[in-house]
């Protein structure tokens, strides 16, 4: 009887061992299959604001298809969700922001996104609202500017260049300035900080507005043609728009394919002919 029980137990142990072994092989095969599938993934998903970023991406679709990739462009209308989606793994890259904004986003959110490569810059402009020119601006007039750190600095520097305000010494394009850094405001201007995407709509309610290049383009405004004054080109180049990815993925096959397609003569020609100075390539 003891021998019979021992034999049964030994058989059970043997069966368990075989089952465990079989499970390990199955799991290993599944993992290998998953890795292979990931390696075969030829869809590049990029988040972008509609104008000009999504339009520029779409101009590169054919070049990517020639390399065996499908480009999936996901459009966003604000400056936060494209980075959040990239951090969460919903995107392979995004294309909407300049380096100072990206650095500030990482700092404020504890994220680790990286600029994969440079693309273009969009000059900021001051646009007429209820007041038609800088010369006609009256005491106490209202001016709308973007409320996010790096772009607010950019707007304030432009107002300073226009002779409307004076900022503290040391404020430059890399600073994180607000209207509290204004030291002189001779016309007692009412400077209103609002979300960048709302700036074009604010023109009906304010005397002037300093508008980001992409949102100006969406409102059929061209900084080179329609603004009262555009920012210093040296400042503008500090704010080069980049394609961003998760840190460590800058040299991945997808990002390098995207770089090759976007930094092409065909895309440069498309940008020059389409935006006529409102978007300036840097490659």
List PLM regions with ranges.
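Sec-dependent N-terminal signal peptides of Gram-positive bacterial secreted proteins and lipoproteins
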Residues: 2-24
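Ligand-binding "clamshell"
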Residues: 104-116, 130-131, 205, 210, ...
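Short helix-initiation/N-cap motifs at beta->coil->alpha
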Residues: 73-84, 172-201
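A conserved helix-loop-strand patch within extracytoplasmic ligand-binding domains
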Residues: 116-165, 268
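Short, well-ordered beta-strand elements
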Residues: 39-51, 69-75, 142-143
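Periplasmic-binding protein-like
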Residues: 153-160, 262-283
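Bacterial lipoprotein signal-peptidase II cleavage site
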Residues: 17-40
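A bilobed periplasmic-binding-protein/Venus flytrap-type ligand-binding module shared by bacterial periplasmic
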Residues: 123-134, 239-252
């Amino acid at each position: 009887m003891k021998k019979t029980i021992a034999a049964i137990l030994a058989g059970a142990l043997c069966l368990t061992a075989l089952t465990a072994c079989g499970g390990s092989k199955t799991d290993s095969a599944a993992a290998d299959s998953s890795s292979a599938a990931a390696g075969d993934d030829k869809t590049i998903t990029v988040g972008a604001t509609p104008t000009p970023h999504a339009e520029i991406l779409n101009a590169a679709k054919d070049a990517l298809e020639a390399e065996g990739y499908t480009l999936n462009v996901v459009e966003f209308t604000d400056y936060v969700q494209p980075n959040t989606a990239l951090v969460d793994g919903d995107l392979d890259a995004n294309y909407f922001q300049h380096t100072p904004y990206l650095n500030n986003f990482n700092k404020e959110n504890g994220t680790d996104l990286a600029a994969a490569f440079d693309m273009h810059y969009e000059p900021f402009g001051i646009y007429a609202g209820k007041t038609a020119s800088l010369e006609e601006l009256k005491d106490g007039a209202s001016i709308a500017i973007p409320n996010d750190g790096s772009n607010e600095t950019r707007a304030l520097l432009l107002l300073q260049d226009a002779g409307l305000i004076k900022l503290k010494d040391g404020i430059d394009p890399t600073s994180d300035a607000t209207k509290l850094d204004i030291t002189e405001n001779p016309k007692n201007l009412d400077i209103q900080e609002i979300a960048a995407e709302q700036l074009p709509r604010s023109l009906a309610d304010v005397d002037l507005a300093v508008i980001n290049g992409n949102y100006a383009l969406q409102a059929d405004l061209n900084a080179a043609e329609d603004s009262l004054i555009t920012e210093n080109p040296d400042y503008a180049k500090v704010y080069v728009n980049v394609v961003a990815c998760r840190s460590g993925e800058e040299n991945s096959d997808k990002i390098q394919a995207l770089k090759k397609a976007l930094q092409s003569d065909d895309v440069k020609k498309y940008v020059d002919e389409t935006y006529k100075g409102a978007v300036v390539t840097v490659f």
